[in-house]
Design a protein with these regions (language model features):
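Short catalytic/metal-binding and nucleic-acid-binding patches
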Residues: 1-194
Length: 194
């Protein structure tokens, strides 16, 4: 039997589904689901690379979780010009450069789930983010209801390092921040003078 000479690719929605204020749950898997790459050093390097991709393409990440063999990211576009496919390509290229230095790389394509309108409603959206945050719990890396202690979970909104996903007022502050950024953009004179 002949084997295909090319790798199968995941089907994607139309380009427009990943643009503007789209909300997408991305999963990036290490090739062959190998482990051994995740460390505190890599986590902070990943956050640096993620910051550049998110700022460049106007993306916010209310929850991220690096697991031993894969990464979960919930992204939402901040501006009408936001493009998550370009942001993901940018991030994967930079991350793969770093991963290859230590003998790892991502699988060819990330998995994505573009959230439908009903999945973007506040309670459902927050529940989806909590599901991502509880990955370490389901994997037995932390105890039941100890997912907030997992050291490789966080959030990233460019310009707002003070946001912490497990603080009691997080979602109120996150929503206010995203609304402000959508209205005023990532850089404004007011921000620069504060």
């Amino acid at each position: 039997m002949n084997q295909p000479s090319h790798r199968d690719h995941l089907r994607r929605l139309p380009e427009s589904a990943y643009c503007g204020h789209a909300v997408v749950h991305w999963t990036l898997t290490i090739r062959e689901r190998r482990t051994g790459w995740l460390s505190a050093e890599f986590y902070y390097h990943f956050r640096e690379l993620l910051t550049h991709s998110q700022f460049r393409y106007a993306i916010a990440c209310p929850i991220l979780c690096l697991m031993p063999d894969h990464i979960h990211l919930m992204w939402l576009g901040l501006l009408t010009c936001s493009n998550q496919k370009l942001a993901m390509r940018h991030l994967r290229t930079r991350c793969n450069e770093s991963l290859r230095r230590i003998g790892f790389e991502f699988q060819d394509q990330p998995y994505d789930h573009v959230l439908r309108e009903e999945e973007r409603q506040e309670l459902t959206f927050v529940a989806s983010c909590e599901y991502i945050a509880r990955n370490p719990e389901r994997a037995g890396l932390v105890g039941v209801d100890e997912y907030a202690t997992y050291p490789f979970t966080g959030c990233l909104v460019p310009g707002y390092p003070e946001l912490k996903p497990f603080e009691s007022d997080y979602w109120t502050r996150f929503d206010r921040t995203v609304a402000w950024l959508r209205k005023n953009g990532l850089i404004s004179g007011q921000q620069m003078n504060e």
